[in-house]
Design a protein with these regions (language model features):
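Conserved PLP-enzyme active-site core in the AAT-like
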Residues: 5-8, 12, 16, 44, ...
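N-terminal "arm"/small-domain region of PLP-dependent enzymes with the aminotransferase-like
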Residues: 1-33
Length: 184
């Protein structure tokens, strides 16, 4: 018998512990994702998702793990042979690189020690050197270390180029402001 003092805690980036009200909601009957009750829920939460992500743009929920969302972004935003810049400072920055290579993209990497934030000036320098880069792939927060990267500053830099900024916000959204429209 475990007491409240000896409750096991999940100290991982995922899965995470659930609040009691979430556990209660998960105990309800399932609804079909192609029926009206589900559509009504999606219609109701869409405006809230926009506020959460700091955007006026439509937000598209995906029914997959975070890696699936990263794969969806790369496969839908770029074509085989496109050049992308990956700035990595941990496991999930490396995941961007792996996904991009697997999709047939030409990857230019900037690697930093785990636990360090990506210096925006390095992104600026590389984009000046390589104006043919179609996209910059970064984390808002590197899940493996907890470091928040300066997405706002990097967004200002990418707006001055033709490169599309693609941000993995999986471990940042909900715990740190992520004003996507302002960041670009």
């Amino acid at each position: 018998n475990r007491s409240m003092l000896h409750k096991e805690r999940l100290l991982t980036p995922g899965p995470t512990e659930l609040a009691p009200q979430v556990k209660a909601a998960l105990g309800r009957d399932m609804i079909h994702h192609r029926k009206d009750p589900f559509r009504q829920i999606m219609h109701r939460i869409q405006p809230e998702l926009g506020r959460l992500f700091g955007t006026e743009q439509p937000v598209m929920p995906l029914a997959c793990a975070g890696t699936g969302a990263m794969q969806a972004a790369v496969s839908n935003l770029f074509r085989s042979g496109d050049k992308v810049l990956v700035a990595k400072a941990g496991k999930f920055g490396q995941r961007w690189e792996d996904i991009a290579r697997n999709q047939g993209l030409e990857v230019d990497s900037l690697a930093y020690p785990w636990g360090e934030a990506i210096p925006p000036e390095d992104i600026a320098d590389r984009l000046k050197e390589r104006p043919d880069i179609a996209g910059v792939l970064i984390q808002a927060s590197e899940t493996s270390t907890g470091v928040l990267h300066p997405v706002g500053a990097i967004g200002r830099i990418t707006r001055e180029s033709d490169a599309l900024l693609v941000v993995d916000g999986i471990s940042a959204v909900g715990i740190s402001p992520c004003p996507m429209d302002r960041w670009g």
